[in-house]
């Protein structure tokens, strides 16, 4: 992205110095976004290959005789189950650890959280630089793992992204070990980033900006940072035990030596359930700002919105075993986790109805960011979440495509749509150039139709009893699988179109000549700065009237 030249120091920064050695929070945020986009492209390519295989019954593409991109009915094809497992595993690992959190927390969080609170930079700029390059190392390790020797004398670890033992402890080759190291490094970069965010938020707010005057996106990133800080060390301990079981003869998860594989499930999901809220909370913050801007109204219920995010974060830590209803828990335990899980619907409902109340009576402008916010179908995932929170119903739905549909409505039509909303909302601010509105709207409709075509039919497949993570299925399931795969092709085409939109915008987009190119309801501090912001922002700290409407109108 082109930088605005504001002084002679900036003119001396070459390309290498700026992008490889930068400690500037804005540049590091952009780096996070681009790297997450690259990891996302790899991950969705794996997704499309999965959906190609599942479009029709029988195995057509993933053959032991060799991978194919074109089905050949005349040629023999022995199913390559390891390749299938590898594709499933790395799609999950990349998306969960290297795409959504780095984009929302590392990208938008790094770039805009300091701007929202009027801070000149992050509290620890060099730590910020270290966090990013550790993230690059993590992505590199994950891709190296995909290409390294694994089980069945083939590349990659085919154990699922959750790395459950005994599959993960018995998988041959060192691809599994590299995957564990990739997750470790991902955890380290997130923990360092979280420490930085928390310190910045607590110590570097503009004069007069008390806690409950901080914009909702900054609050969302701050709460997410606490969740990362409290949950990722637990995951680190669990996968270290896994590494020890694989290489040093310990038996933490081996019943033959007194271990217990269910212990690993508890450790993993104590991290894994807060993880889904870490992925979605920054998205909640973005959606709040977008809806407020394009409904031309202040956000409804600011304080309940903050408290709802804090409640979601707290409750997220005490519901982990709802992933484990079928793992032999007592009825008493299941009853507790069932009730606690349904309780999360209350603060989530507060947020959803506050967004609706913000739009109610507003003068709504259907620009591209607002379309993404309106299509933020996290709510559909939330409704199916209440269904599978019931232990009795989960007996039926566990490990079926109903779970896949539930999870992807939360992640794909939730977190991913929030990333797109944030990109279109802020790309003019970050680059100084605006996207073509028609292209943004076309991308939205392609992705919206494609995503719903993929995941909505999967509810039906789950209801019919189709288990997830299988390379083949009976012909009875073929109708909805075919529709789901068509949706995947439409979504993939829309993602490639989005990449084109981003590069067109950066190099040929219409220049933005004003700080605030939306309207007066885009009222956080970044809209007082030039587009793009200069390298050094808020060297003179902002005054209350710059960000507080009550002060400005006195």
Curated annotation (Swiss-Prot):
Task: Tell me which EC number(s) this protein carries.
Answer: 7.1.1.9
The question of whether Lipoprotein is a record keyword is answered with no
**UniProt source species:** Paracoccus denitrificans
| Note on how the cofactor is bound | Binds 1 copper B ion per subunit.
Share an example GO biological-process annotation for this protein. Answer: electron transport coupled proton transport
Which pathway does the protein contribute to?
Answer: Energy metabolism; oxidative phosphorylation
What taxonomic ancestry is recorded? Bacteria, Pseudomonadati, Pseudomonadota, Alphaproteobacteria, Rhodobacterales
The protein's gene is named ctaDI
Q: This chain belongs to which protein, by name?
A: Cytochrome c oxidase subunit 1-alpha
Molecular function as annotated in GO: cytochrome-c oxidase activity; heme binding; metal ion binding
**InterPro entries membership:** Cyt_c_oxase-like_su1_dom, Cyt_c_oxase-like_su1_sf, Cyt_C_Oxase_1, Cyt_c_Oxase_su1_BS, Cyt_c_oxase_su1_dom
Q: Which residues bind Fe(II)-heme a?
A: 91, 408
């Amino acid at each position: 992205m082109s930088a605005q030249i504001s002084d002679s120091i900036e003119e001396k920064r070459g390309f290498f110095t700026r992008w490889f050695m930068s400690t500037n929070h804005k540049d590091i945020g952009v780096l996070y976004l681009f790297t997450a986009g690259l990891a996302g492209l790899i991950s969705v390519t794996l997704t499309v290959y999965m959906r190609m295989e599942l479009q029709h019954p029988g195995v057509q593409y993933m053959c032991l005789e060799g991978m194919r991109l074109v089905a050949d009915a005349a040629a023999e094809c022995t199913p390559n189950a390891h390749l299938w497992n590898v594709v499933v595993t790395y799609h999950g690992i990349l998306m969960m650890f290297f795409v959504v959190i780095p984009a929302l927390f590392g990208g938008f969080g790094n770039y805009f959280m300091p701007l929202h609170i009027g801070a000149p930079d992050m509290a620890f700029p060099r730590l910020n630089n270290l966090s990013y390059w550790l993230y690059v190392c993590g992505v590199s390790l994950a891709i190296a793992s995909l290409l390294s020797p694994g089980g069945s004398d083939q590349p990659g670890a085919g154990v699922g992204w959750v790395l459950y033992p005994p599959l993960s402890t018995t998988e041959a080759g060192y691809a599994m070990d590299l995957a564990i190291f990739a997750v470790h490094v991902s955890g380290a970069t997130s923990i360092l980033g979280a420490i930085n965010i928390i310190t910045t938020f607590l110590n570097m707010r503009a004069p007069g900006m008390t806690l409950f005057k901080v914009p909702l996106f900054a609050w969302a990133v701050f709460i997410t940072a606490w969740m990362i800080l409290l949950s990722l060390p637990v995951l680190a301990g669990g996968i270290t035990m896994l590494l020890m079981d694989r290489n040093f003869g310990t038996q933490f998860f081996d019943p033959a030596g007194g271990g217990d594989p269910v212990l690993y499930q508890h450790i993993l999901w104590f991290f894994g359930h807060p993880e889904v809220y870490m992925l979605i909370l920054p998205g909640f913050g973005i959606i709040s700002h977008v809806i407020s801007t394009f409904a031309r109204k202040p956000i409804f219920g600011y304080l309940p919105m903050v408290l709802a995010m804090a409640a979601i974060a707290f409750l997220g830590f005490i519901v982990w075993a709802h992933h484990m209803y079928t793992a032999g828990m007592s009825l008493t335990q299941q009853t507790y986790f069932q009730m606690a899980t349904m309780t999360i619907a209350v603060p989530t409902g507060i947020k959803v109805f506050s967004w609706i109340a913000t739009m109610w009576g507003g003068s709504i402008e259907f620009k591209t960011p607002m379309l993404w916010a309106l299509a933020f179908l996290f709510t559909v995932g939330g409704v199916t979440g209440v269904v599978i929170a019931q232990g009795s119903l989960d007996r039926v739905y566990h490990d079926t495509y109903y779970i896949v549909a539930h999870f992807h409505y939360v992640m794909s039509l939730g977190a991913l749509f929030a990333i797109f909303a944030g990109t279109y909302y802020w790309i003019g601010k970050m680059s100084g150039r605006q996207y073509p509105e028609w292209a943004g709207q076309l991308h939205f409709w392609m992705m919206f139709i494609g995503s719903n075509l993929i995941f909505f039919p999967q509810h039906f497949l789950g209801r019919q009893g189709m288990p997830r993570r299988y390379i083949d299925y009976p012909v009875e399931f073929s109708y909805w699988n075919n529709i789901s795969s068509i949706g995947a092709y439409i979504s993939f085409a829309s993602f490639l179109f989005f990449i084109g939109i981003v590069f067109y915008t950066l190099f040929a987009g219409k220049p933005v000549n004003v700080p605030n190119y939306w309207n007066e309801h885009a009222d956080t501090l970044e809209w007082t700065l030039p587009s793009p912001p200069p390298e050094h922002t808020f060297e003179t700290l902002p005054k209350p009237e710059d960000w507080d409407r009550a002060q400005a109108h006195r």
